[in-house]
Design a protein with these regions (language model features):
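Glycine- and acidic-residue-biased ligand/ion/polar-headgroup-sensing regions
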Residues: 48-61, 65
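Short histidine-centered beta-strand/loop micro-motifs
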Residues: 21-24, 33, 41-46, 64, ...
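A cytosolic small-molecule/anion-sensing beta-strand core signal
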Residues: 56-57, 73-74, 92
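Short acidic-glycine-tyrosine-enriched beta hairpin
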Residues: 66-82
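Short beta-strand segments in beta-sandwich/barrel cores
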Residues: 40-42, 58-63, 77-78
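A short, N-terminal "cap"/entry segment at the start of jelly-roll beta-barrel domains
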Residues: 1-29, 42, 63, 112-121
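Ligand-binding loop in jelly-roll beta-barrel domains
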Residues: 82-106
Length: 121
C-alpha cells in the first residue's frame, strides 16, 4: 500500500495553476491541483477517461459540458464524463485532487500538465 497525505506541502504558484502528480501508473493518475484566487484552467477535456474531482479546500467555479458555471467548495465530488469539456476558476485559494483511469501521459513532466490539451485531465 502507498500512503500519500493530501493536506501537506501544498504549493501555490503566483504565475498560474500548479499540478502535482501524486501517483501515476499504467492504471491511473491522482493529481493535486492548487490555484490562487482568480487563477484559471482553460477549457480542456480528458478524451479517454472520466475525470473525478474532489475539492479539498477553498471555493471555485467549475463548468462542464453544459457550460453552466457552478460554485463548489470543500468536500464536493465532481464527475466529468470522458471527453467532457470543463473549466476552472478559483474564487479563493483552491485545492482539489483529480483522478483519471489509465495514464497515456505518464511520461509527461508535471509542468506540462497545464500547457497542452492532451496532458490535461
Amino acid at each position: 500500500m502507498k500512503f500519500i497525505s493530501l493536506v501537506e506541502n501544498w504549493e501555490f504558484d503566483p504565475k498560474g495553476p500548479h499540478a502535482d502528480p501524486l501517483h501515476v501508473d499504467k492504471n491511473g493518475r491522482a493529481i493535486l491541483f492548487t490555484l490562487e484566487t482568480e487563477q484559471t484552467i482553460r477549457e480542456h477535456n480528458a478524451p479517454s477517461s472520466p475525470f473525478y474531482v474532489v475539492i479539498l479546500a477553498g471555493r471555485g467555479v467549475f463548468a462542464g459540458g453544459d457550460d453552466v458555471e457552478r460554485v463548489v467548495g470543500a468536500n464536493t465530488l465532481l464527475v466529468f464524463e470522458p471527453g467532457e469539456k470543463h473549466t476552472v476558476r478559483a474564487l479563493e485559494n483552491l485545492v482539489f485532487i483529480g483522478f483519471l483511469h489509465g495514464a497515456p501521459g505518464a511520461q509527461i513532466k508535471p509542468s506540462a500538465l497545464l500547457e497542452t490539451d492532451e496532458a490535461l485531465p
